[in-house]
A protein has these predicted regions:
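Short, charged/polar connector segments at secondary-structure boundaries
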Residues: 1-72, 79-93
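Conserved small/polar residues in nucleotide/adenosyl-binding loops
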Residues: 180-186
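Alpha-helical interaction elements
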Residues: 91-179
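Residue-level "edge-of-site" marker
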Residues: 72-73, 159
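Intrinsic-disorder/low-complexity regions
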Residues: 14-17, 30, 39, 50, ...
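Conserved aromatic
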Residues: 74-75, 139
Length: 186
């Protein structure tokens, strides 16, 4: 059984997830207290939370409440980021800006997966591509993401640019990201 103290937060992973509103967080906390357990597991990769950051924060206030952890297997950090984006895109309450950011981030990360040719810890052949070997995939990252979300490649391109802009704004002015990716933008 995983202990709460063993769970780690990666800021990049957490930043892909739109935080719930105060009311939503409060309702989740009340539900957890009423049930006396966390109904949905916290999902991790190598001990880092990829889904369940809010549940984790609530559990830190009430460490006696039982919870479950499911460890996912991803071959790289990029695959974990793609999973986070896809998981978040499954939410019903996303604003158009949140959806655009996640689609852009997914496309950007899919490209990084394709361009990864191994490092000092992995063989290039394990990465799925070998340097100087042509990429034999029929469609590029944009067309793949566009097909997954029922949109056009040009929309995915604009979404990538939007996501890069949001991340640049966040780097320049911490907290600026919330203006574009949260309900506060309304």
């Amino acid at each position: 059984m995983t202990k709460l103290s063993q769970l780690k937060i990666d800021p990049e992973f957490q930043n892909q997830i739109n935080p719930p509103s105060f009311e939503e967080t409060h309702q989740l906390e009340m539900n957890i207290l009423k049930e006396e357990r966390v109904l949905n597991p916290i999902i991790t990769w190598n001990g880092y939370i990829v889904d369940g950051h809010t549940r984790y924060q609530i559990l830190r206030k009430y460490p006696f409440i039982p919870f479950e952890v499911i460890e996912k297997e991803f071959s790289s950090r990029y695959e974990a980021l793609v999973w986070i984006c896809k998981n978040q895109l499954g939410r019903r309450n996303l604003t158009p800006e949140q959806k655009k950011f996640l689609i852009g981030k997914q496309a950007e990360t899919e490209k990084q997966i394709k361009s990864f040719h191994g490092n000092q810890y992995t063989l290039a052949s394990e990465s799925g591509l070998v340097q100087n070997e042509p990429d034999r995939t029929k469609h590029g990252s944009r067309s793949k993401v566009a097909a997954e979300h029922g949109t056009s490649e040009s929309y995915v391109y604009r979404a990538e640019q939007f996501a890069k802009g949001v991340e640049a704004a966040e780097e320049a002015v911490p907290g600026a990201c919330l203006l574009y990716t949260s309900d506060a933008a309304d």
